[in-house]
Amino acid sequence: MLKTHSCALTQENIGTEVTLAGWVHRRRDHGGVIFIDLRDREGIVQVVFNPEQSAACLDIGKELRSEYVLQVKGTVSHRPAGTENSRMLSGLVEVVAEGAKILNTAKTPPFYINEEVEVDESLRLKYRYLDIRRQGMKNNLIIRHKTVSFMRQFLNDRGFIEIETPILIKSTPEGARDYLVPSRLFPGQFFALPQSPQQLKQLLMVAGMEKYYQVARCFRDEDLRADRQPEFTQLDMEMSFVDENDMMQLMEDLFTGLVASVRPDMKYNKKFPRISFADAMEKYGCDKPDLRFGMELADITDIGASSAFGVFKNVAAQGGAIKAISAPGCGGYNKSQQEELINLAKKYGAAGLVPISLGAESGELKDLTMEMVKSVSAKYLTLEEIKTIAERSGAKPGGLILIVAGARKMVNSVLGEMRNHLAAKLDLCDKNELSFAFVVDFPLFQWDEEGKRWDSVHHPFTAPLESDLPLMDTDPARVGSRAYDVVCNGYEIAGGSIRIHQADLQRKVFHLLGYNNEQIDERFGHLLEAFEFGAPPHGGVAPGIDRFVMLLAGETSIREVIPFPKNQAAQDLLFGAPSVVDDKQIRDLHIRIQTEKE
């Protein structure tokens, strides 16, 4: 080994002869004595090149520059009094160099590695191997390692078996577009990269494996967001002979144990509340609510219907909804600031937004007067109506009430977006807190207005509630599902369900989704046939590793916790992928590139 110790040296190492190897983090020349900070994965330690100790070492020290790769031999000693550095783990010790060797030189990096300064992301992705040397990225990848290690051990301890499933599979689109791989041996035919191992893990339950998991790579050719990548990693799990409560208890134990192990400094709830899908939409405007703050949506349709405000009366008369949220401390917003919120609501899909300011000064609701109220709608509402709206939305003097009226689905969606926007703007969320919950009682189907057909809310393998089976023929919209999501801080971090395990029921669901028998047999015949050989009741779940590590690391993009991610245009800037390939490779695959003109 070229090193005997890491650079994370402490007082316990004083007097020890060590051989270190790492990168020059900083270099300082103090009039004949050279100091460097030597960095490796574990830490940073000060190394002293003193001519009284070794003139040859000093000559090497003079050659050093940032990011040179260096081996040093020396003895760990106390730093002289007054030179200690409390900001470093090794700040009480130093190594006086007795021997040194430059293992490699380095060009000047395109950005500072020894400073946590903001760097253009494109540059970071192009030089990702340098970016990972920086403290933030290094720590994120260590958190990722600890997370995956805990997950594996947790499931191993509970009798799960890790089984790898194929990456080259049949294309059976599950919502997003597949990544296709042309077959050289079978011209005109294609493999697909898996969007998830969904059918494979269900087949493993038919095979009698009972408890399966894998750290699975998944691929989806979809539009990207901060928490999306074309390839991502999930902890894929499936169990036989379980119900929803069994799976949710497993998830609660997994996530609470994981946080306690990997980030014990973070606050988190050990018991996860269960919120119905309907309640989540009505109270928070989305099915993955951030519960670190309140600002729940308040239904004021009845107040609007009986008020003198024509806009509200018309919406209520047409069966629409009128809802409000309260922005604390925003009562002093001027016209320009309120206009900004109105435009934001329109961007999210509302026809407009009605702000009601309760004055700039804080106080109690009982002391509110009409003189304190500032709103274009104030002349249409009585003081009692405004107080009731304020009471329902949790507003007090000094706050700002925001009201949206229209179709219920739109109202919920717009105010849900406004709620999250205001929470970020007003800094209402504790960044060191993880607020978990289960969202349950999802519908099985949703109507696609554009396609004029039913879609699965989750996926077509989710089991319906047994009590709702008669509704499949008469009212699919009312059929409930046996699905459960784990949400945290406004993100879905795991989605799961009890699965269909009867061939006839699975075929019926496919029919409702618009497949005919020929399409069903061609795409899913292997699964339906397997169900005829004694498929056990089973269920599963798949926590997204990238997304949860993002939350553990306190980041806002999964690109910050993936070693070599694609950018937001799905490009790999380091390797230059996707790229043009050799004509012979194209010909060997029996495919032709069609130009735009064609």
UniProtKB/Swiss-Prot annotation:
Gene3D superfamilies membership: Bira Bifunctional Protein, Domain 2, GAD-like domain, Nucleic acid-binding proteins
Record note on quaternary structure: Homodimer.
Gene designation: aspS
InterPro entries tied to this protein: Aa-tRNA-synt_II, aa-tRNA-synth_II, aa-tRNA-synth_II/BPL/LPL, Asp-tRNA-ligase_1, Asp-tRNA-ligase_1_N, Asp/Asn-tRNA-synth_IIb, AspRS_core, GAD-like_sf
UniProt region (Aspartate), positions on chain: 198-201
Entry keyword set: Aminoacyl-tRNA synthetase, ATP-binding, Cytoplasm, Ligase, Nucleotide-binding, Protein biosynthesis
UniProt-annotated site: Important for tRNA non-discrimination, residues: 30, 82
Name of the molecule in the record: Aspartate--tRNA(Asp/Asn) ligase
Binding site for ATP: 220-222, 229, 492, 544-547
Molecular function terms from GO: aspartate-tRNA ligase activity; aspartate-tRNA(Asn) ligase activity; ATP binding; nucleic acid binding
Principal subcellular localization: cytoplasm
